[in-house]
From Swiss-Prot:
Residues 1-26 are annotated as: Disordered. Signal peptide: none annotated. It comes from the Eukaryota. Pfam families: Coiled. This is HssA/B-like protein 40. It comes from Dictyostelium discoideum (Social amoeba). One of its GO terms (biological process) is sorocarp development. Belongs to the hssA/B family.
Length: 101
C-alpha cells in the first residue's frame, strides 16, 4: 500500500447530522480507490458529511466509495457534496490527468 507522506491535520466538526473531516494532502485511507484518488487530489467526501474540499484535498475515505474531489473537485463520495476547489461533477479527475495519475 502506498501512502503519501505529507503534513496532515485532521479536524472533526459535528453539526446536526453533518460531519466533515479535513486532511491536507493525506493519501491514507481504507476505501477501494482512496489511495489512487488521495493526496492533493482528494478522495471522498468523508464518512457522513459534506467535506468542503477547498483546494486542500480530502484524502480520507472509509466508505469504499471514493470519488476524486478536494483540489480537483468531483463527486463527494457516497454522501458528500462535491464542493471541490476547481469544480467537477462525477469524479472525472480520479485517475485522470487532473490528478496526474
Amino acid at each position: 500500500m502506498t501512502l503519501f507522506s505529507s503534513i496532515s491535520s485532521m479536524s472533526t466538526s459535528m453539526s446536526g447530522s453533518k460531519s466533515s473531516i479535513s486532511s491536507f494532502g493525506s493519501g491514507t485511507g481504507m476505501g477501494s480507490n482512496s489511495i489512487a484518488c488521495g493526496g492533493g487530489c482528494g478522495g471522498s467526501g468523508g464518512i457522513l458529511g459534506s467535506g468542503l474540499g477547498l483546494g486542500l484535498g480530502l484524502g480520507l475515505d472509509l466508505t469504499g466509495g471514493s470519488r476524486s474531489r478536494g483540489a480537483c473537485g468531483g463527486n463527494g463520495g457516497n454522501r458528500g457534496n462535491g464542493n471541490g476547489g476547481m469544480g467537477g461533477g462525477n469524479g472525472s479527475c480520479c485517475g485522470g490527468p487532473c490528478c496526474g495519475i
